[in-house]
Amino acid sequence: PDLQGFDLDCVELMPLYEAMQEMKMILWLHVGDAREQINASSPERVARIAEGFPALKIVAAHFGGYREWEKAEECLIGRFGNVYYDCSSSLWDMTPERGKYLIEKCGTDRVMFGSDYPAITPAVSLAEFLRLDLTEEVRDAVLYKNFMRIVAGSPE
């Protein structure tokens, strides 16, 4: 949205979100930019979509807002049962402690691993993820179990 020149919550997209909700599709979004002059994919915009379409499953990339993590905590994280997160292209830009905190804050059952390839290679993203002080159970959940449950519909 930031590069394409539209806002995530623009009125023209509402019929699309409605159709996706009816079809039980997943809306996977780039979120965040931290450039106030653009702000097309802010956590606030995702929150408005989540509120307006409570049965639409949303995955908010970059922990709900690339470089807007505080804003994501204020208006998005923990507020909507239909919003999930990925950690793509974020862990390299924060301390391991902050990464662990965000995984826990978002919910260890609601975060999925992601690389944001080609921006960040999978090898770099995985190395950044593995440096976090997480239990094996949480690590496995984020690396694949959450995806299997949230996206693929597997019970585990």
Predicted regions and their residues:
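The substrate-binding groove and active-site-proximal loops of carbohydrate-active enzymes
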Residues: 1-7
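Catalytic pocket-lining loop regions of alpha/beta-barrel enzymes
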Residues: 7-112
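Short glycine-enriched loops at secondary-structure junctions
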Residues: 65, 118-119
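Mid-to-C-terminal alpha-helical segments outside catalytic/metal-binding sites
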Residues: 105-112, 119-156
